[in-house]
From Swiss-Prot:
This is Proline--tRNA ligase. Its main location: cytoplasm. HAMAP family: Pro_tRNA_synth_type1. InterPro entries: aa-tRNA-synt_IIb (IPR002314), aa-tRNA-synth_II (IPR006195), aa-tRNA-synth_II/BPL/LPL (IPR045864), Anticodon-bd (IPR004154), Anticodon-bd_dom_sf (IPR036621), Pro-tRNA-ligase_IIa (IPR002316), Pro-tRNA-synth_IIa_bac-type (IPR004500), Pro-tRNA-Synthase_IIa_type1 (IPR023717). Keywords: Aminoacyl-tRNA synthetase, ATP-binding, Cytoplasm, Ligase, Nucleotide-binding, Protein biosynthesis. GO terms for cellular component: cytosol. CDD domains: ProRS-INS, ProRS_anticodon_short, ProRS_core_prok. Its EC number is 6.1.1.15. It is found in: Cytoplasm. Belongs to the class-II aminoacyl-tRNA synthetase family. ProS type 1 subfamily. It is an enzyme of class 6 (ligase).
C-alpha cells in the first residue's frame, strides 16, 4: 500500500472529548471517527487492525472445534420473553417495533437466538457436543458511552455457545475454550490474566474473565504472590483473620461525637485507627409474600469496603443491592446513617469476618452525634451472623493458601460461562438421550470483545510518540520512509525495489510516498505504530546502507542495502 493512495487521516492534536489514551491515539492515528455518542466509523488503518484480531480469534476458535455461523442482529422480542430476560434486562436493551407493530430488540448477545436455533436443528445426543460461534455486531444502549470503542454502544464481538448432554461434557469444552482464549491473547502479544469472575446478568455457575493488565483498567484484579490464583476483586474471598479474637479489655462507653459522621471524622475525633472502628450499612431485604421488604444491617471494619456482589449473594438480601432510605434507617436504628451501630437493631445483622475479629471497637451509638467505644461482640452485641462481605485489600492472605494478594487494574476483553440449563430449560431445548428420553441440554457461552481488544492493546502498548503494535495485529508490518524521493531518483528506485520485494515475500508494507517533510513522515508512522521501519536517504545510499528502526525499543541500526530484506524477514519470523 502507498500512502498516496491511502486514507491516512492522522491528527496532530488530541480531540477534547477523548479521555483515555487508547481513544486519543485511535483518533489521532486515523483508526476511527465518531459518528454519534458511542458510535464509530472504522477507517482503513483501524479496520486492518480489527481484521487481524478477528483472524486470530477465528483461527483459534476453529482449532478448538467451534463452528462459525452468523445470526441476525435484530431479534424477535418473543425469544427474550420466553427466556425471561425481556423483563430482567434494563434500558441498555434497545427495543424497537417493525411496521406491523411487532416488538424486536437489537441484540446485545445471542443466547436466546442460538438456543432457538439448536432446539430445532439438534434432536439427538449423537449430534452433541456442539459449539457454534460468530463474529458480529452487537448493540447495547449504554447510559453513558465513554472511552471510545472501549465502552461504545455498537461493537464487534465474538460470541460462542456450546451445547452438551451433561455437565462433564460442558466442563471439558469449557476447558478447551479457556485454553483457546489463552492462545488468542498470547498470539496478540498481550499481558493478560484469566481470573475467577461473577456470572452477572448472563447467569450460570462457573465463570472466568480475561483481563489485559493496564493502569487505565476499570476492574481491579487480585493475584497471589506465590501461585497462579487470580480473581476479580468482586469474587476474591477475604479470609477470616488467623487466631482467636482478642479478649475485651475496655468497658462500653457512650461518647459525644458532634459533627463526626464519616469513619475518617470519627477516628480523627476519637484518636483511634480506622481499622478499630465499625461502619454499619442498612440495605433492603427481599420482599415477603405480602410485598413488604425488611432491612438488613451489614457491618464492616471502618477501613474496608463493602463488596456488593458478595452482599447480593447472601440469602434474604435484595438484588440489585439497594441501600435503605433515611426514613427506613430512622425506623430501624433511631438515628441518621452516620451514627448507626450493630447493637440492639431490630433487624438481621451480618458482620464481615474481619469486623467480627475486633475487640474493644468503636461504633455508632444509634443516637445522633454519639458513638460507643470499648464495644465487644457477644458481650455488647448479640444475635449476629458472620460472612465474607468485603473487598480484599493488598496484603491479604491469598484464598489459595499460598502467598498474599497483589492488586492490579485490568480491562476485561473476554468472559466465559458455564450456563448450565438456564436458557435451555426456559426455552425447552431438549434432545433425546440413549434411552430415547428428552433431556435438557447443558450450555456454555464464551465472549470476546473484539473492538475492545484493539483499545486494550493500545492501553498496554504506547509511548509519548504513539501506538506500539505487536507484529501480529499491526495495521502494517513494515513502513518504508524514503526521504526526498521526489527529488532523488535513486532513493525512489531503492524504495520501489524494497516495496516490491517485501510485497512479493508476503509482507504487509506501507510505502510513504507523500511529498512531505521527513519529520512529518516519521511522526505519522510512529503515531500509527508500525513495528519496523526502513529509512532511505541519499547519504545512506552513498555508504551502501539504509537505516532500520524497531518501533518498540526505538533502536536504530544501519544495515547493508542487500541485507535489509533478509533482516526484516528474520525479525518477522521471531
Amino acid at each position: 500500500m502507498r500512502t498516496s493512495q491511502y486514507l491516512l487521516s492522522t491528527l496532530k492534536e488530541t480531540p477534547n472529548d477523548a479521555e483515555v489514551i487508547s481513544h486519543q491515539l485511535m483518533l489521532r492515528a486515523g483508526m476511527i471517527r465518531k459518528l454519534a455518542s458511542g458510535l464509530y466509523t472504522w477507517l482503513p488503518t483501524g479496520l486492518r487492525v480489527l481484521h487481524k484480531v478477528e483472524a486470530i480469534v477465528r483461527e483459534e476458535m476453529n482449532k478448538a472445534g467451534a463452528i462459525e455461523v452468523s445470526m441476525p442482529v435484530v431479534q424477535p422480542a418473543e425469544l427474550w420473553q420466553e427466556s425471561g430476560r425481556w423483563e430482567q434486562y434494563g434500558p441498555e436493551l434497545c427495543r424497537l417495533t417493525d411496521r406491523h407493530n411487532r416488538p424486536f430488540v437489537l441484540g446485545p448477545t445471542h443466547e436466546e437466538v442460538v438456543t432457538a436455533l439448536v432446539r430445532y436443528e439438534v434432536n439427538s445426543y449423537k449430534q452433541l457436543p456442539l459449539n457454534l460461534y460468530q463474529i458480529q455486531t452487537k448493540f447495547r444502549d449504554e447510559v453513558r458511552p465513554r472511552f471510545g470503542v472501549m465502552r461504545g454502544r455498537e461493537f464487534t464481538m465474538k460470541d460462542a455457545y456450546s451445547f452438551h448432554m451433561n455437565k462433564e461434557s460442558l466442563i471439558e469444552t469449557y476447558g478447551k475454550m479457556h485454553q483457546a482464549y489463552c492462545n488468542i491473547f498470547s498470539r496478540m502479544g498481550l499481558d493478560f490474566r484469566p481470573v475467577l469472575a461473577d456470572t452477572g446478568s448472563i447467569g450460570g455457575t462457573g465463570s472466568h474473565e480475561f483481563h489485559v493488565l493496564a493502569n487505565s483498567g476499570e476492574d481491579l484484579i487480585a493475584f497471589s504472590t506465590e501461585s497462579d490464583y487470580a480473581a476479580n476483586v468482586e469474587m476474591a474471598e477475604a479470609l477470616a483473620p488467623a487466631g482467636e479474637r482478642p479478649a475485651p479489655t475496655e468497658s462500653a462507653t457512650k461518647i459525644a461525637t458532634p459533627n463526626a459522621h464519616t469513619i475518617a471524622e470519627v477516628s480523627a475525633y476519637l484518636k483511634v485507627a480506622e481499622q478499630q472502628t465499625l461502619k454499619t450499612l442498612l440495605v433492603k431485604g427481599e420482599e415477603d409474600e405480602q410485598g413488604k421488604a425488611g432491612v438488613i444491617a451489614l457491618v464492616l471494619r471502618g477501613d474496608h469496603e463493602l463488596n456488593e456482589i458478595k452482599a447480593e449473594k447472601i440469602a434474604g438480601v435484595a438484588a440489585p443491592l439497594t441501600f435503605a432510605s433515611e426514613e427506613e434507617i430512622r425506623a430501624v436504628a433511631g438515628c441518621d446513617a452516620g451514627s448507626i451501630g450493630p447493637q440492639n437493631l431490630q433487624c438481621r445483622v451480618i458482620v464481615d469476618r474481619s469486623a467480627a475479629h475486633l475487640a474493644d471497637f468503636v461504633c455508632g451509638a444509634n443516637e445522633n452525634d454519639f458513638h460507643m467505644t470499648g464495644m465487644n461482640w457477644d458481650r455488647d452485641v448479640q444475635g449476629y451472623e458472620v460472612a465474607d462481605i468485603r473487598n480484599v485489600v493488598e496484603g491479604d492472605p491469598s484464598p489459595c493458601g499460598k502467598g498474599t494478594l497483589l492488586l492490579k487494574r485490568g480491562i476485561e476483553v473476554g468472559h466465559i460461562f458455564q450456563l448450565g440449563t438456564k436458557y435451555s430449560e426456559a426455552m425447552n431445548a431438549t434432545v433425546l438421550n440413549e434411552a430415547g428420553k428428552a433431556t435438557v441440554m447443558e450450555m456454555g457461552c464464551y465472549g470476546i470483545g473484539v473492538t475492545r481488544v484493539v483499545a486494550a492493546a493500545i492501553e498496554q502498548n504506547f509511548d509519548d510518540r504513539g501506538i506500539i503494535w505487536t507484529d501480529s495485529i499491526a495495521p502494517f508490518q513494515v513502513v518504508i520512509i524514503p526521504m526526498n524521493m521526489h527529488k532523488s531518483e535513486r532513493v525512489q528506485e531503492l524504495a520501489e525495489r524494497f516495496y516490491n520485494e517485501l510485497q512479493a515475500a508476503g509482507v504487509e508494507v506501507l510505502l510513504d510516498d507523500r511529498k512531505e517533510r521527513p519529520g512529518v513522515m516519521f511522526a505519522d508512522m510512529e503515531l500509527i505504530g508500525i513495528p519496523h521501519s526502513i529509512v532511505i536517504g541519499d547519504r545512506s545510499i552513498d555508504n551502501g546502507v539504509v537505516e532500520y528502526k524497531y518501533r518498540r525499543s526505538g533502536d536504530k541500526t544501519e544495515v547493508a542495502i542487500d541485507e535489509i530484506i533478509a533482516k526484516i524477514k528474520a525479525q518477522l519470523n521471531k
